[in-house]
């Protein structure tokens, strides 16, 4: 696989990829959101007719680092921020990214502002590193004299697109690093989570990964 291929992956849902006529495929049903559905790997946030998740490990890291993605087509070149590259179902349920037919993702730019800054990435999966994530987290911070000056945190495996945790970031900036602050970040991360029938385990998993990211980056 390639970096571009990882970022531009389609939704991870066996009903959708198996050819079921779901909302994302142009139908009028979400087969993953019923009491009998197999949905342990599906979303906790921002479900809008579709509960499939973005399966990319790279995407949260690019969002945390405020990366830019360069896209080319016959008309020329355009640059899109990593956070704006991904499309939520409520905007357009038929696609996961802003890529149009004929578009090619040619490069990814990482801003110098985050060079040599504290960064953390972790994912939880059923098997080894090459498996799809159940939940992943990426965090980038600037810490001076024990106080968090800047923070960007993004997670994957919990929504249809990689999710930037702006409320968590706000709870960290200007605060002294420590266990209590990390605990607060974990609890803030899961506010508003809605578990499906078979994925309630993702809520404490998300809280713990965010908590660990804050402890590791600020430690």
PLM features: residue spans?
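C-terminal structural segment of proteins
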Residues: 1-219
